Amino acid sequence: MHTVQKDTTFTKIFVGGLPYHTTDASLRKYFEVFGDIDEAVVITDRQTGKSRGYGFVTMSDRAAAERACKDPNPIIDGRKANVNLAYLGAKPRNLQSAFTIGVQQLHPAFIQRPFGLTPQYIYPPAIVQPSVVIPTPIPSLQSPYIDYNAATQAFTHYTTAAYEQYPYAASPATGYMGYGYTSAVQQPLSATTTTATTGAPPTAYIQYQPQQLQPDRMQ
């Protein structure tokens, strides 16, 4: 004859955070004030026989289990434990995690902004991406001279604020390599003169280092 197993969904309690000296008897002694107990067991290690720090208590009825779980963090055998219905799982001792507390301490203005930075530290796209600073589609770059009109029209869509922040001698912190003294495309006279002197094809940035002709080389 098979016995009908009792439904313990709302009567079986998980008890965590127990001290290692807690036994079945001491666990039962604490919970018996809430009502009749069917079972009280402290889970122990099979090899050492020592407590693993948690156990289960099955109350006789649902009302007794609700009274036992009213205090989620009772003091059992001198230590703060955590109590919850077993089917709900272990309940943390503190509902607010460290991450939640840390986020609450931040100012809402920093949470809403990207990367947690204020607007004056967010560089415009023209500064963040060096490839965008000088538009690549300049047809005249294939020729020895730079088309001043095409280069000027390509720069009209940039704002004045973004253009003024561009460093002439950028530091590694901004993501650029140091160019020394550079001459931008908006100076066609310097670019044309350098091209005619050196014979090298113009690039987006031209090294502006005037060379002095030596008298002995011209002889």
UniProtKB/Swiss-Prot annotation:
SMART domains: RRM. CDD domains: RRM_RBM24_RBM38_like. Its main location: cytoplasm. It comes from the Eukaryota. SUPFAM superfamilies: RNA-binding domain, RBD (SSF54928). Keywords: Cytoplasm, Developmental protein, Differentiation, mRNA processing, mRNA splicing, Nucleus, RNA-binding. Residues 11-88 form the RRM domain. One of its GO terms (cellular component) is cytosol. It is found in: Cytoplasm, Cytosol; Nucleus. One of its GO terms (molecular function) is RNA binding. GO terms for biological process: cell differentiation; mRNA processing; RNA splicing. Pfam families: RRM_1 (PF00076). Belongs to the RBM38 family. PANTHER family: GEO13361P1-RELATED (PTHR48024), RNA-BINDING PROTEIN 38 (PTHR48024:SF28). RNA-binding protein that specifically bind the 3'-UTR of VegT transcripts, leading to maintain their stability and stimulate their translation, thereby playing a role in germ layer formation. VegT is a localized maternal determinant essentially required for endoderm formation. Also has some proneural function in the open neural plate and in the context of retinogenesis. May also act as a mRNA splicing factor. May play a role in myogenic differentiation. This is RNA-binding protein 38.
